[in-house]
Amino acid sequence: MANHDPISDMLTRIRNASEKRHEKTKVPASRMSLSIAKVLQSEGFIAEINEEGEGFRKQLILGLKYTGKHRSPIIRSMQRVSRPGLRIYKNTRGLPKVLGGLGIAIISTSNGVMSDRDARKQGVGGEVLCYVC
């Protein structure tokens, strides 16, 4: 069966693996999923990104991060905002702050995929892909 929303699939795989305390999770590779993974890594939500396979079988292996003695997941919540049936676009002033700045919104802009903080610094808006906190 075809996957009509690969971003939601990626977020769900990360969320499920994080809740089950897995060290790593595999995500089908695409330019968008790699860009989102790089933003998550730069913001400290995931530890590492590796690629495996070739062509259509290419996958990203994401190393998840945990904190404390009981290995609490760093990623507490991931929520898809813009979806194929309802795209959500915001200008620079309309970019959301997630949990008062404790979380991030991942934005797809004309300058590439970036966090809401970077988009504000660069003065660009775009499609709000998801919230992570």
UniProtKB/Swiss-Prot annotation:
GO terms for biological process: translation. InterPro entries: Ribosomal_uS8, Ribosomal_uS8_CS, Ribosomal_uS8_sf. One of its GO terms (molecular function) is rRNA binding. Keywords: Ribonucleoprotein, Ribosomal protein, RNA-binding, rRNA-binding. Gene3D superfamilies: 3.30.1370.30, 3.30.1490.10. PROSITE patterns: RIBOSOMAL_S8 (PS00053). Residues 16-26 have a biased composition (Basic and acidic residues). Pfam families: Ribosomal_S8. Residues 1-28 are annotated as: Disordered. GO terms for cellular component: ribonucleoprotein complex; ribosome. One of the primary rRNA binding proteins, it binds directly to 16S rRNA central domain where it helps coordinate assembly of the platform of the 30S subunit. Belongs to the universal ribosomal protein uS8 family. Part of the 30S ribosomal subunit. Contacts proteins S5 and S12. NCBIfam families: PRK00136.1. This is Small ribosomal subunit protein uS8. It comes from Prochlorococcus marinus (strain NATL1A). The lineage of its organism: Bacteria, Bacillati, Cyanobacteriota, Cyanophyceae, Synechococcales.
